[in-house]
From Swiss-Prot:
Highest taxon above the source species: Eukaryota
Organism placement in taxonomy: Eukaryota, Metazoa, Ecdysozoa, Nematoda, Chromadorea
One GO cellular component, as annotated: nucleus
SMART domains (UniProt xref): Zpr1
Family indicated by similarity: Belongs to the ZPR1 family.
Keyword annotations from UniProtKB, A to Z: Metal-binding, Nucleus, Repeat, Zinc, Zinc-finger
A GO molecular-function annotation: zinc ion binding
ZnF segments: C4-type: 28-60, 247-279
Keyword Metal-binding set for record: yes
GO biological process: protein folding
Protein name: Zinc finger protein ZPR1 homolog
Localization in the cell: Nucleus
Length: 455
């Protein structure tokens, strides 16, 4: 079955002459004559398997293109926020499913889900499609509704201004299937203008994807009378907790197991695991069990011996990774929280960069880009094999990440820890600036500024 799937979904390549599209005769929706639909199953680098469909009618000239995901719905939905400031931002490739919604707050533009088919386009192409759709019947509107036509003309000018970068604007792409993507122009560094986050789908989104019955309603979970009562936190740490949930793979009922665990010379972490008895799907995740520390922590590890690669590492979602020797930067949300080793962390980083770099290794890529990416990945392999001395830096503004010391409780000569005060921007990203951490039990009701005061 796996071999058949590989044969169907081929990688895009000009040298693969066997990857010809399937041609199917179909009725044109405009003139009702016989047209031609071309279907091709392919795999998009750093994305997933997709089904490309293109229709063309030789009689009336009608054309239509569509993309459908060939993958299952992902475990979580995806929200991507891109700040468009430079010309290269307009050229970023964008992939979305038909269930995705797009919003541009500066234009008060919202494209709801299922109003457009899934497609592979660019950031600029999103606005071009809106501009083209609004411009279609403008001549008729000027005759029938001059005032409405003038308002649309003014709106089209705003869209043109955004496409020409007359002003900075924001694109928000929300896809409950998780099958969406916006290209990072530089795979080696953190994308400074793009934020990717994953979220749990709400009931409406689950109904949209047919993951919930149309008549299903949100249920209020009542505490079970048989639930164990813990006398202390230490008692709770000895118990493996079970939570009912749906399997993200087959969507059948299963459960998540969770247990707090103490890491020596560090703090408590929460280990969560899921194993579905129906389809065999498994997943593991580690979360910090403590509060956000007063200071951030920057840990530097010199990779010189095999023991350094075998060090245990707890990386939280907010922890960024960098290797100065090869000019590598990986943002905090690029890799999910995990408990692994230095070698495992580097291997996971390489696998993600290797998949993402496929955008720069295709037929349209320049020779210089191909050689630069190939050389970069080779250097990362040399670091993992200890052929190239390097220093890995883990920077966690919450201070909740951990790297094992080989000489604890004594100082480790190849492990350096530096504590620092977070910036205002880092506190704002963590939501600390809006928290009331002192006398929070004495909160007074706040009146809205625009609310009229009673005399």
């Amino acid at each position: 079955m796996a071999a058949d799937s590989q044969d169907i979904y081929r990688n895009l390549s000009a040298d693969d002459y066997e990857a010809a599209p399937i041609v199917v005769d179909s009725v044109c929706p405009v003139c009702e004559e016989d047209g031609e639909t071309r279907i091709m199953c392919t795999s998009i680098p750093y994305y997933r398997a997709v089904i490309l469909m293109s229709f063309e009618c030789p009689h009336c000239g009608h054309k239509n293109n569509e993309i459908q995901s060939g993958e299952a719905v992902q475990e979580h939905g995806t929200l991507i926020v891109l700040r468009v400031q430079k010309p290269e931002d307009l050229r970023r490739q964008l992939v979305k499913s038909e269930y995705a919604s797009i919003e541009v707050p500066e234009l008060q533009l919202e494209i709801p889900h299922k109003s457009q088919p899934g497609e592979v386009t660019t950031v600029e192409g999103v606005l071009e499609r809106v501009h083209r759709g609004l411009s279609q019947d403008q001549e008729k509107r000027r005759l029938l509704d001059p005032e409405g036509a003038s308002q649309i003309d003014a709106y089209l000018q705003k869209i043109t201004s955004c496409m020409e970068l007359g002003e900075t604007w924001t694109l928000r792409l929300r896809d409950p299937t998780g099958n969406c993507y916006i290209q990072n122009p530089d795979v080696r560094h953190v994308d400074p203008r793009c934020i990717i986050s994953h979220y749990h789908r709400n009931l409406d989104e689950r109904k949209l994807l047919a993951l919930a019955d149309d008549n299903e309603e949100e249920e209020e979970v009542e505490p079970s009378a048989a639930a164990p009562e813990f006398k202390s936190y230490e008692d709770a740490k000895q118990e493996v907790l079970h939570f009912a949930t749906d399997c993200p793979n087959c969507h059948g009922p299963t459960e998540v197991k969770m247990k707090p665990t103490d890491i020596p010379f560090f703090q408590t972490v929460i280990i969560m695991s899921l194993a579905c008895d129906r389809c065999g799907y498994k997943s593991n995740e580690v979360k910090s069990g403590g509060a956000i520390r007063d200071q951030g922590c920057r840990m530097s590890v010199k990779l010189e011996k095999d023991l350094d690669l075998a060090r245990d590492v707890l990386k939280t979602d907010t922890c960024a990774l960098s290797i100065p020797e090869i000019d590598l930067e990986v943002g905090g949300n690029a890799l999910c929280g995990r408990f692994t080793t230095i070698e495992g962390l580097l291997t996971a980083t390489k696998e993600q960069l290797d998949a993402q770099s496929s955008f720069f290794m295709g037929d349209s890529a320049q020779t210089g880009e191909k050689s630069a990416v190939t050389t970069f990945l080779e250097k990362l392999d040399d670091i993992i094999a200890l052929r190239l001395p390097a220093t890995i830096i883990l920077d966690d503004p919450t201070g909740c990440s951990y790297v094992q010391s080989l000489t604890a409780p004594m100082d480790d000569p190849r492990l350096t820890k530096e504590f620092y005060t977070r910036t205002y921007e880092q506190n704002d990203e963590l939501g600390i600036n809006d928290m009331k951490v002192e006398n929070y039990g004495e909160l007074d009701a706040l009146a809205e500024e625009d609310e009229p005061h009673e005399a």
